[in-house]
């Protein structure tokens, strides 16, 4: 999948317009205004969607998320048919990416998701049209999110909430905080530890990362689940 724009035209690929996303969001929010049920938009990808949600949240209660891929990359990163960047929703323009980051910073967007969709290499080493969509994202989610803290675009507290307490509230699970009575699921992070994404160092069985060879800052050092340490770097 690729954004319907200049890059798709240059590569001779059929793109997906932002209107495909906008129409669904506007339709669902119109229904939500009448039905009054719980509603979550899993992954936004366009500036126009952020604008719509900002206006609708003044009168309607719902939540929304964004993929870390769409916060960190844009359609130009696809370059010459990089199939590891064939994602759903597609990467859009740099202007869209900046609007998504601002939407997160302003509290319009509630959660950041990994959009973890591992695929074996054979399914990605095909033509762009034939390749499967998706990227392995769990192991790079935190570090890519912290990029926006390190460059000053999003407060650390906002990033932490978007990765922990906000998803827990949406799913109504007893997690995401260190308050008394909550499940002791947490991690210890070195905010400044530098590392480089290398396929051979990823724990995931599938290595289809969207950010191979990218230099990142911030790393999980320990992970605890229900108080038990399950991972240590």
Report residues per predicted region.
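His/Asp/Glu-enriched, well-ordered alpha-helical/loop segment
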Residues: 10-36, 105-112, 117-191
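C-terminal cap of metal-dependent C-N hydrolases
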Residues: 127-130, 183-233
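Glycine/Thr-rich phosphate-binding loops of Rossmann-like dinucleotide-binding domains
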Residues: 50, 72, 120-122, 187, ...
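Histidine/acidic residue-rich metal-binding segments in metalloenzymes
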Residues: 1-112
């Amino acid at each position: 999948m690729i954004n319907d724009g200049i890059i798709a035209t240059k590569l001779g690929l059929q793109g997906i317009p932002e209107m495909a996303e906008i129409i669904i969001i506007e339709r669902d929010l119109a229904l939500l205004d009448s039905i009054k049920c719980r509603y979550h938009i899993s992954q936004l990808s366009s500036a126009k969607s952020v604008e719509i949600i900002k206006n609708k949240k003044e009168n309607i209660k719902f939540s929304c998320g964004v993929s870390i891929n769409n916060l960190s990359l844009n359609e130009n990163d696809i370059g010459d048919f990089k199939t590891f960047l064939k994602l759903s929703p597609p990467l859009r323009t740099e202007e869209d990416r900046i609007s998504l980051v601002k939407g997160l910073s302003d509290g319009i967007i509630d959660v950041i998701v990994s959009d973890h969709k591992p695929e074996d290499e054979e399914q990605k080493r095909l033509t762009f049209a034939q390749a499967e969509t998706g990227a392995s994202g769990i192991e790079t989610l935190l570090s890519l999110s912290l990029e926006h803290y390190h460059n000053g675009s999003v407060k650390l507290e906002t990033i932490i909430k978007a990765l922990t307490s906000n998803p827990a509230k949406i799913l109504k699970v007893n997690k995401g905080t260190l308050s008394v009575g909550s499940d002791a699921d947490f991690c210890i992070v070195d905010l400044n530890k530098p590392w480089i994404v290398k396929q051979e160092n990823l724990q995931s069985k599938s290595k289809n990362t969207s950010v191979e060879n990218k230099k990142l800052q911030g790393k999980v050092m320990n992970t605890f689940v229900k108080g038990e340490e399950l991972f240590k770097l």
